[in-house]
């Protein structure tokens, strides 16, 4: 039996053993542990209880307790001989943001409040963002994936040109890239890792929402490795708190254009974002704090206080605002969830 993040607790002859799966310790003998005395009209039962390491949760049809039957099989009354699984916890950072702080002039993330934030280096060394959504998959933008590639490039062409880091500069290998089938209007792609990452306080996925957290005025946090006020890529992860903006005002600000990269007279940055039913805007007009080049692919993270869980309400697509264009543009996570789950299941 082997499972990432799993621990088995065994009660044998009255002695409790904790066995970490993967350590080749399936046979346990302890001569110093005597067999418990028999009792009238009773018997001794051998039990195992499956538990998970910190930052993992047990997924099982039963209670995780298995007994040894007459055929020498470990079985559970509800699950039979089907073993439980340890799944990665999402959206539960050990050191969540605890300040209302306003990644141009944003704050440094000294505590590891955004363990889902990944750094992706594209072809020719450009820094972009990606967001861990499971222990083996990340979301980023299709535009990030196509940086310095032609429009004719395929997912197989792109994957070998990317370098990806999670946690404190932990290099991870990429197995494949999957592009959204409507990437011209839904600026999203998925990255699958060759191996599952071990979830820790420094590396943890963020949850995808089942309900919509996007409403004007709703505050969210965006972290990133993008350019700073000096237009240089930051060496340390930074974050900023921004409100969801009124969609109509945002569209008016960008001349209501839905044509990507179309130059306009009003747009302060000379290009237009993709704006449609799959996107929302966030940003401030009175402060210097903002996302900037290189932050795309990062999550608009919101905290559900009732569940005490962090969700990715969106993924930053248009990161060229840089405290000049007022609004960054995000792809709605609720519009992605079905496609993401189907893609991960198929691959």
Swiss-Prot record:
Species: Rattus norvegicus (Rat)
Signal peptide boundaries: 1-18
Positions glycosylated per UniProt: 148, 152
Protein keywords: Acute phase, Antibiotic, Antimicrobial, Antioxidant, Disulfide bond, Glycoprotein, Hemoglobin-binding, Immunity, Secreted, Serine protease homolog, Signal, Sushi
Record carries keyword Oxidoreductase: no
Domain annotation Sushi: ranges: 31-88
A Pfam family of this chain: Trypsin
Listed name of the protein: Haptoglobin
A cellular component annotation (GO) from this entry: extracellular space
Disulfide topology: 52-86, 90-207, 250-281, 292-322
PANTHER family cross-referenced by the UniProt entry: COMPLEMENT COMPONENT 1, S SUBCOMPONENT-RELATED, HAPTOGLOBIN-RELATED PROTEIN
Compartments where found: Secreted
Summary of the function given for this chain in its UniProt record: As a result of hemolysis, hemoglobin is found to accumulate in the kidney and is secreted in the urine. Haptoglobin captures, and combines with free plasma hemoglobin to allow hepatic recycling of heme iron and to prevent kidney damage. Haptoglobin also acts as an antioxidant, has antibacterial activity and plays a role in modulating many aspects of the acute phase response. Hemoglobin/haptoglobin complexes are rapidly cleared by the macrophage CD163 scavenger receptor expressed on the surface of liver Kupfer cells through an endocytic lysosomal degradation pathway.
Tissue: Expressed by the liver and secreted in plasma.
């Amino acid at each position: 039996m082997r499972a990432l993040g799993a621990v088995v607790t065994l009660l044998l002859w009255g002695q409790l053993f904790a066995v970490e799966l993967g350590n080749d310790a399936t046979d346990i003998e302890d001569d110093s542990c005597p067999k418990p005395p028999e009792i009238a009209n009773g018997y001794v039962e051998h039990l195992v209880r499956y538990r998970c390491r910190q930052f993992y949760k047990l997924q099982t049809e039963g209670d995780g307790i298995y007994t040894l039957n007459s055929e020498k099989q470990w079985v559970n009354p509800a699950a039979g001989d089907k073993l439980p699984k340890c799944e990665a916890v999402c959206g539960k950072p050990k050191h969540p943001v605890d300040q209302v702080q306003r990644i141009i002039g944003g704050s440094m993330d000294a505590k590891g409040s955004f363990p889902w934030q990944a750094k992706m280096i594209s072809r020719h060394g450009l820094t972009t963002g990606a967001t861990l959504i499971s222990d083996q998959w990340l979301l980023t933008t299709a535009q990030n994936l196509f940086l310095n590639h032609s429009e004719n490039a395929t997912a197989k062409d792109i994957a070998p040109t990317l370098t990806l880091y999670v946690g404190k500069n932990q290099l991870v290998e990429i197995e494949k890239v999957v592009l959204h089938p409507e990437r011209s209007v839904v600026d999203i792609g998925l990255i699958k890792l060759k191996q599952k990452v071990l979830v820790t306080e420094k590396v943890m996925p963020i949850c995808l929402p089942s309900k919509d957290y996007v409403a004007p005025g709703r505050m969210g946090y965006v972290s990133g490795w993008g350019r700073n006020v000096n237009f240089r890529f930051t060496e340390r992860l930074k974050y900023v708190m921004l409100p969801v903006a009124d969609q109509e005002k945002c569209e008016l600000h960008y001349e209501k254009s839905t044509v990507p990269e179309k130059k306009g007279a009003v747009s302060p940055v000379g290009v237009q974002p993709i704006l449609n039913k799959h996107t929302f805007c966030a940003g401030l007009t009175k402060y210097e704090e903002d996302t900037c080049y290189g932050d795309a692919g990062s999550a608009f993270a919101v905290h559900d206080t009732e569940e005490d869980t962090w969700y990715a309400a969106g993924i930053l697509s248009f990161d060229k605002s840089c405290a000049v264009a007022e609004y960054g543009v995000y792809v709605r996570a609720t519009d992605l969830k079905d496609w993401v789950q189907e893609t991960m299941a198929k691959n």
